């Protein structure tokens, strides 16, 4: 009986997903503001996070056509910006492991996302089309 119980417990632990921290629009805006992100960017960032990851820090995208994946709340691509767990080639412009985007703290993801923004602009995110004209208000968040 003990062996059966341990087997069932092990099976449950193996299939239970790690959910990470899931932010709300306002909790993300406040946290990013605390990390120094300009207030005039916060509505755009919350829109991108909503469409990229549903505000989930543990989000890992499905494989892209070039074999890369996107990681974390802002779905940062491992071919250009972070070192993938597989050890595959990456330009790793943010000088960070992709796994560092999958933690509860968004600070590493925010720093890298700000670099992506500086180098490529908002259009670096394919979901920007949902955030280009109508942005969610963050006025009620502060």
From Swiss-Prot:
It is an enzyme of class 3 (hydrolase). Residues 21-142 form the C-type lysozyme domain. GO terms for biological process: defense response to bacterium; killing of cells of another organism. Pfam families: Lys. It catalyses: Hydrolysis of (1->4)-beta-linkages between N-acetylmuramic acid and N-acetyl-D-glucosamine residues in a peptidoglycan and between N-acetyl-D-glucosamine residues in chitodextrins. The active site is at residues 52, 70. SUPFAM superfamilies: Lysozyme-like (SSF53955). InterPro entries: Glyco_hydro_22, Glyco_hydro_22_lys, Lysozyme-like_dom_sf. Induction: By septic injury caused by dorsolateral puncturing with a needle contaminated with lipopolysaccharide (LPS) solution. Lysozymes have primarily a bacteriolytic function. Shows antibacterial activity against Gram-positive bacterium M.luteus but shows no activity against Gram-negative bacterium E.coli. Likely to play a role in the eradication of ingested pathogens during their passage through the intestine. Belongs to the glycosyl hydrolase 22 family. This is Lysozyme 2. It comes from Lucilia sericata (Green bottle fly).
């Amino acid at each position: 009986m003990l062996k059966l119980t341990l087997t069932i417990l092990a099976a449950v632990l193996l299939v239970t997903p790690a959910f990470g921290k899931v932010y709300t629009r306002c909790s993300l805006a406040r946290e990013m503001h605390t990390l120094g992100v300009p207030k005039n960017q916060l509505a755009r960032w919350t829109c991108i996070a909503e469409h990229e990851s549903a505000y989930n820090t543990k989000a890992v995208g499905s494989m892209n056509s070039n074999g890369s994946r996107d990681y974390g709340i802002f779905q940062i691509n491992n071919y250009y910006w972070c070192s993938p767990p597989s050890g595959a080639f990456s330009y790793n412009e943010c000088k960070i492991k992709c796994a560092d985007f999958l933690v509860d703290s968004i600070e590493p993801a925010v720093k890298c996302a700000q670099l992506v923004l500086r180098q490529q602009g908002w259009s670096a995110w394919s979901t920007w089309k949902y955030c280009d004209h109508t942005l969610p208000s963050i006025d009620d968040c502060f």
